[in-house]
Amino acid sequence: MEFIIKSLLDTDLYKFTMMQAVLHQYPGAQVEYRFKCRTPGVDLARFINEISHEIDGLCGLCFSKEELDYLRGLRFMKPDFVDFLGLFHLDRKYLQLRASSQVPGEIELDIRGPWLHTILFEVPLLAIINEVWFRNTSVLNLDVGRDRLDAKVRLLKDESGYEECSIADYGTRRRYSRQWHAELLPLLAQGLGSNFVGTSNVYFAKQYGYTPLGTMAHEYLQAFQALGPRLRDSQVAGLEAWAREYRGDLGIALSDVVGLDAFLGDFDLYFCKLFDGMRHDSGDPFKWGERIIMHLESHRIDPRTKVLVFSDGLDMNKVMRLYQHFRGRCRLAFGVGTSLTNDLGPTPLQIVIKMVRCNGQPVAKLSDSPGKSMCDDPGYLHYLRQVFGVSADV
């Protein structure tokens, strides 16, 4: 049986854009990531040998000349970074996988090492765990997936007024299988037509000629909590470092690392003018959008010149409701994940890999959705909330 991950490009674009910034600005940073399955009663431990075998396959991959040439053709990729990738591979020594000694059936997966050399682990590891689980616990029925996908496409296309609704695939980490992902994308592109604007998956963007999409993830801004600036200034430092790296390119800022209130407090006139827009990934998307628009208007910036990207737990119905609510008031884009890549019948797994430490210090995300925060140091979490004025229910 061939390995699940066949290319190091089979990941999200923002892993490469963050990795490039790390190479240029923080090549010595040391980090720790931790896996968590939020779905109760999932016995992953019985498949630990299979998962381990797939990880061995992942760590045997390197970038081909064709893949490096593709990356070199992306306007925001610097030659020295692509040259570095030509020498790169994922090293198993940075990863520890074992059955949990605390909870029967659970696995413990920790990644520790240089940020530069571990940042590419997350997405393929999650894709591996998903696919190993589903191929052992369910029967693949692509007809169900095709029928459900067709229904979603028709839901949008049969209604008028959605001609400029931009939808992208953000579903690599939660996909049912690589096979389904590979089949789904051409079907989605054909069905949606001009509504389909690309995918976060670099491998499939290259294979099918789609636009690869993505800027930054939570880990990027989280790391700045331990990279030198005063904690209260960490988010500003992260955004300024991004601006130094990309000089106005890749200008979508993530708004929920320490909550929306703190983000808006940091996102001053300079950032409002510099960045192209913001991405929503937790909390009520309607309230979030209204507050973003109000914030832009308070700085005398026309919201219609900025893009609001929604990417939190979307399905086609939610996309359409959000589009109707905000259309004409700002530019809009929607990144749909699990609803596209893992809707074949079985219940999708809620699994994540999050950065929990950087340079030996705890880091955390205080999202706008209760229960989505993840940190291994309760004292630090309390301090972080205190510094950014975030209540204890997130």
Curated annotation (Swiss-Prot):
Pathway: Cofactor biosynthesis; NAD(+) biosynthesis; nicotinate D-ribonucleotide from nicotinate: step 1/1. It is an enzyme of class 6 (ligase). The modification Phosphohistidine is found at residue 218. GO terms for molecular function: nicotinate phosphoribosyltransferase activity. CDD domains: PncB_like (cd01401). Its EC number is 6.3.4.21. Keywords: Ligase, Phosphoprotein, Pyridine nucleotide biosynthesis. InterPro entries: N/Namide_PRibTrfase (IPR041525), NAPRTase_N (IPR040727), Nic_PRibTrfase (IPR006406), Nic_PRibTrfase-Fam (IPR007229), Nicotinate_pribotase-like_C (IPR036068). It catalyses: nicotinate + 5-phospho-alpha-D-ribose 1-diphosphate + ATP + H2O = nicotinate beta-D-ribonucleotide + ADP + phosphate + diphosphate. GO terms for cellular component: cytosol. One of its GO terms (biological process) is NAD biosynthetic process via the salvage pathway. It comes from the Bacteria. Belongs to the NAPRTase family. Catalyzes the synthesis of beta-nicotinate D-ribonucleotide from nicotinate and 5-phospho-D-ribose 1-phosphate at the expense of ATP. HAMAP family: NAPRTase. This is Nicotinate phosphoribosyltransferase. It comes from Xylella fastidiosa (strain Temecula1 / ATCC 700964). The lineage of its organism: Bacteria, Pseudomonadati, Pseudomonadota, Gammaproteobacteria, Lysobacterales. The gene is pncB.
